[in-house]
Amino acid sequence: MSQRQVLQVFEQYQKARTQFVQMVAELATRPQNIETLQNAGVMSLLRPLLLDVVPTIQQTAALALGRLANYNDDLAEAVVKGDILPQLVYSLAEQNRFYKKAAAFVLRAVGKHSPQLAQAIVDCGALDTLVICLEDFDPGVKEAAAWALGYIARHNTELSQAVVDAGAIPLLVLCIQEPEIALKRIAASALSDISKHSPELAQTVVDAGAIAHLAQMILNPDAKLKRQVLSALSQIAKHSVDLAEMVVEAEIFPVVLTCLKDKDEYVKKNACTLIREIAKHTPELSQLIVNAGGVAAVIDCIGSCKGNIRLPGIMMLGYVAAHSENLAMAVIISKGVPQLSICLSEEPEDHIKAAAAWALGQLGRHTPEHARAVAVTNTLPVLLSLYMSPESSEDLQLKSKKAIKNILQKCTYLPALEPFLYDAPPNILKHVVGQFSKVLPHDSKARRLFVTSGGLKKVQEIKAEPGSLLQEYINSINNCYPEEIVRYYSPGYSDTLLQRVDSYQPL
């Protein structure tokens, strides 16, 4: 047998290995093949190929493993149990850029599923190696490493802290300054994942100088980058007044308001979220947003989108309104009430309706003027029907009831109150009658209208416990009228008259 023939055996074996890993990597891109591959024992066949003498076979084997592990936690678990992680971590430090990208992809695919799987990656010493990859010359390697670190950090505080302790943050801040858009996106996303868990972790990101660099990218034309930048700033600002003020000091207003008009729905949503996370802390921060035109811009934004995209904007209006009557009035003047009423009526999902109900309650609870601004939009009957509907979620019923009470307790606009005399359940009716008892003694026109509209008659039909607050309110109303009028409208009065007719003896 000649040397050529002997070498041919090896060449054929190499070709077969190459063909096998390429086919598996290709098959792993389609969900319908995954179970068959798993049952055929693909994991144990790929493992030795990670240490193959041929670099392209190693890389393709890693790529195939990553695609498999990406699908579900069973396959990710198989990577951990198959003792593949230490091999990957070792190769991550030693191999070329193509292999590094593939290995980091496997680590990300395993770590994304659960805190336990992410912990397995930490336990095998991957963080230090991934952080070294953040300094790699190749932007693709940096991106793959940043992506894996972000996926590990997003699970919980402990894993995030482990990423910080490995020294990732200063390098991620350098990555957001690199020219490659994809790298900027992933690094900003990783900083967001780290910041979200606690004020301390967010502070670490701030101390590395991240805010200024993130703020500069708010106007970047790339929508996906803007999403991540706004998300990272939100995750920093949400924790405390100090952190929110640091974000504001980076001069994000009024520039961030342009994002509320963006074509990308998630840029809009994340911009609203950022404004909400700042507004919620203090009246001063809310006032700053009002002064920058932020309230009107958010209201326009809510009008231009639907569903969950609206939610942060709705909540932001509620937070601003909750701080003070002046801030609530700023929302009312900017036409916030009609927009929130539309959300309350239009949105199919209960949690969005509940947020709108809560925000309307915050707007109407300050003074009679505030309550009237909400009541004239015919919002109260909608809130009542949501509260009464058996189809409403528990949270929606609770928020609607609270909003009705908040508004009713300040409302002196009687045309909005009157329908409630007929439709409201006893626990709401008490507040309605209470408001009439406050207004009628001081308004003769309202007293007359209350009689002609049938309100007084309705009040006489209410059955109240003697000595109860409701009975006190009814007595206050009755005291506004001559006794014979009250008697005239009381149930059974016509029977009494007829009895008198029957018992009357003509002279």
Swiss-Prot record:
Signal peptide boundaries: none
Gene3D superfamilies for the chain: Leucine-rich Repeat Variant
Record's subcellular location: Cytoplasm, Cytoskeleton; Cell projection, Cilium, Flagellum; Cytoplasm, Cytoskeleton, Cilium axoneme
Disruption phenotype: In null embryos the central apparatus is unstable leading to a loss, and presumably degradation of proteins to which SPAG6 normally binds, including SPAG16 and SPAG17.
Protein name according to UniProt: Sperm-associated antigen 6
SMART domains recorded: ARM
Gene (UniProt): Spag6
Record organism: Mus musculus
GO MF: microtubule binding
GO (cellular component) term, any one: axoneme
One Pfam match: Arm
Domain of life, per lineage: Eukaryota
Disease: Defects in Spag6 are a cause of hydrocephalus and of male infertility.
Task performed by this protein: Important for structural integrity of the central apparatus in the sperm tail and for flagellar motility.
Keywords: Cell projection, Cilium, Cilium biogenesis/degradation, Cytoplasm, Cytoskeleton, Flagellum, Microtubule, Repeat
Tissue expression summary: Highly expressed in testis. Not detected in prostate, ovary, spleen, thymus, small intestine, colon and peripheral blood leukocytes.
Assembly and binders: Interacts with SPAG16 and SPAG17.
InterPro entries, per database record: ARM-like, ARM-type_fold, Armadillo
Annotated ARM repeat ranges: 31-70, 73-112, 115-154, 157-196, 199-238, 241-280, 325-365, 402-441
